[in-house]
Amino acid sequence: GVGIAAIEIGKIMGAKIIATVGSDEKMAVAKAHGADHAINYREGPFRDGVLEITGGEGANAIYDPVGGEVFEQSLRCIAPEVRIMPVGFAGGTIQKIPANILLVKNVTVCGLNMGYYFGWSDKDVRDQFSPLMQQLLAKEFAWFEAGLLNPRVTQIYALDDFQEAMAI
């Protein structure tokens, strides 16, 4: 999923990756795709683990596709002067953002909805962002062709079964 892509792109960019995942199986998958560390957030708060791994400094950037409680925990182990990027709500709960933590730590929250750049929003800005998106996609395809991005395919569906596949 998007977490695997985030791990692999982070490694390409030279980051030390601490993956927080929801199962032991996902811990193994995260490590197989390049995570330096993996913590199962279902086993309890992961703040202490992240702080231990970072020598008490906290994470320098956080990418969160889960939301809810995971986002709240992430804010508690983020370093000052960095960004946290919520990209979804896979956990089912939309995160609430406590402004006091943002203020005290000088943290920036940066949302990302890729659909905005592809015309899937109220305002169609495809033409404006087309050169940037083409450049980004060309870079991603080059990484894929070089074997640096390795999507995890667990099942293949016919195009006619698109809605069934998306429900999984």
Please tell me what each predicted stretch does.
Residues 1-44:
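Mid-domain Rossmann-like dinucleotide-binding core that forms the NAD(H)/NADP(H) cofactor-binding site
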Residues 10, 30, 62, 74, ...:
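Terminal peptide-recognition signature
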Residues 21, 69-146:
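Glycine-rich phosphate-binding loop and adjacent beta-alpha segment
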Residues 35, 58-59, 102, 149, ...:
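Local beta-strand N-terminus motif with an aromatic residue
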Residues 39, 60-63, 85:
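N-terminal Rossmann-like NAD(P) cofactor-binding module of classical short-chain dehydrogenase/reductase
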Residues 45-56:
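Short amphipathic alpha-helix with an adjacent loop that forms part of the alpha/beta core around
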Residues 141, 146-156, 163-168:
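C-terminal capping/lid region of NAD(P)-dependent oxidoreductase domains
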